[in-house]
A protein has these predicted regions:
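Class I S-adenosyl-L-methionine-dependent methyltransferase catalytic core
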Residues: 1-188
C-alpha cells in the first residue's frame, strides 16, 4: 500500500502483522479524496479508528496542516508511527493510543477539527453509532467541519438526527457517508 498523492506520494505504508485492521484501498482513498480535496489545504484532521493511518496520512500528504490519529491496537499504533516516520509527516501529527470512545469522553475539548474520518470495524455497527452520536465528537468538529464515515453497504450505522447526510458514495461493498451537523452552532 502506498500514499497516492501529495508530498509523500509513492511512499510505502506498512500494515500491522497481526491483521485486525482494514486499510482503505486505493480506490476508496482516490474517491474519498477527490470529494474532500477542496477542504484539505490547512485542515485539522481527526482520524478515528486510524489503524495504520492510511486516511490521515493521505490527508497530510495532500495539504492538511495537522492530523490526530486515535487507535487502540498496539500493533496498529506501531505501524502507524512507522508510517508517519517513513512519510516524514510525524511532525504534523499526534498519535493517541486509546479507545475512541474513551478519547471522545476525555479528549478533544480544546481542539476543533475540519475533517473527521470515522472508520470503525464493519462488524461493529454499534461502535460507529456511538461514535457518530457522541457529544465529544460533536464538540470537536469545527462549524463547517465534515465527518466521513466508512461502512459496509449492508450494515450502515444509524445516523443521528442532528447530522445531515450531505453525500453517500458506494464503492463496491463499501459506502462512504459524508456528514455535517445540521445546526451550524452544534459543532465548535
Amino acid at each position: 500500500m502506498r500514499v497516492i498523492a501529495g508530498e509523500a506520494k509513492g511512499r510505502t505504508l506498512v500494515v500491522p502483522r497481526s491483521g485486525g485492521t482494514r486499510s482503505a484501498t486505493d480506490r476508496i482513498r482516490e474517491t474519498l479524496f477527490a470529494i474532500v480535496e477542496p477542504q484539505l489545504e490547512g485542515a485539522r484532521v481527526l482520524d478515528l479508528f486510524a489503524g495504520a493511518g492510511t486516511l490521515g496520512i493521505e490527508a497530510l500528504s495532500r495539504g492538511a496542516a495537522h492530523a490526530t490519529f486515535v487507535e487502540r491496537g498496539a500493533e496498529a499504533v506501531k505501524a502507524l508511527r512507522r508510517n508517519l516516520e517513513t512519510t516524514k509527516l510525524a511532525a504534523r501529527s499526534v498519535v493517541v493510543s486509546a479507545n475512541v470512545i474513551a478519547y471522545l469522553d476525555s479528549g478533544p475539548r480544546d481542539q476543533r477539527f475540519d475533517l473527521v474520518f470515522c472508520d470503525p470495524p464493519f462488524a461493529d455497527v454499534g461502535i460507529a453509532e456511538a461514535t457518530l452520536g457522541h457529544d465529544g465528537l460533536r464538540s470537536a468538529v469545527a462549524r463547517s467541519g465534515l465527518i466521513v464515515a466508512r461502512a459496509h453497504r449492508k450494515h450502515l450505522p444509524a445516523v443521528p438526527t442532528f447530522l445531515d447526510i450531505a453525500r453517500v458514495k458506494e464503492i463496491g461493498e463499501e459506502k462512504l457517508l459524508f456528514l455535517r451537523y445540521i445546526d451550524p452552532t452544534a459543532g465548535g
